[in-house]
Structures are given as C-alpha cells and as structure tokens.
Amino acid sequence: TRSKLKLEFDDEKKIITLITPGNNKIVISDDQKSILLQDQNSNKIELNSSGIIIDSPKDIKISAKGKVTIDAVGNIESTAQADIKNQGLNINHQANIGFSAKGNATAELSASGQTTVKGGIVMIN
C-alpha cells in the first residue's frame, strides 16, 4: 500500500504474511503448519506442531485479576540463571511421593513464629 503495509499470499505453499512498515508481522503457514506473531522488538509467539513458543529479548509479564493456573500432563520445569522468587500470603508445596529441597552451598528453614518439623522418623545430620 502507499503506507508500505504488505499483505502477501503464497498460493503454492499456502502462506499468508502481513507486514507493517515497522516490521511487525503475522505469518500463517499451512506449509510449515505454524502461525507466527512477531513485533519490531523481536518479541514473538509461534504456534507449531511442536507446541507454543513465547520468546522475548526482554521481560515477559503474566497478570490476571483472577488466578493463574499452569497445568501439564508431563513435567513443569522452571530454571533461571539468577534467583527464582515466590511470594504470597501462604505458600504450599505438596508431593504425592517424594519431596526434596536442597541447597548446594547453604540451606535455611526459619520462621518468626513456631517452626514445626514432622515425620515418621525425623533425622537431623
């Protein structure tokens, strides 16, 4: 168009591409079985046969007025090269079989109020 908006159709590969002058784009591809949403800041969301990829060179924020639920049939994994922080009114962790918490350098369990450690057999050291 006059303002450099592009809408491209590839009938052979069955791909529709929408590109703005600022290089924001949406690509719908039957050939690659994917949908790509990408902005000029290199943030992108890709849906393909492997799943959904959300990628950003900066922060990603998820916010809700209600609750946020993450559910998986397989594992849920989180890793960070810096700290991982959880904060809430109460934090509850429960394992159906085994629970392990380990600090390679240090570990601390503390409370300003009562601290309870329970188990069939409690071993310290």
Model-inferred region functions:
Residues 1-125:
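Right-handed beta-helix
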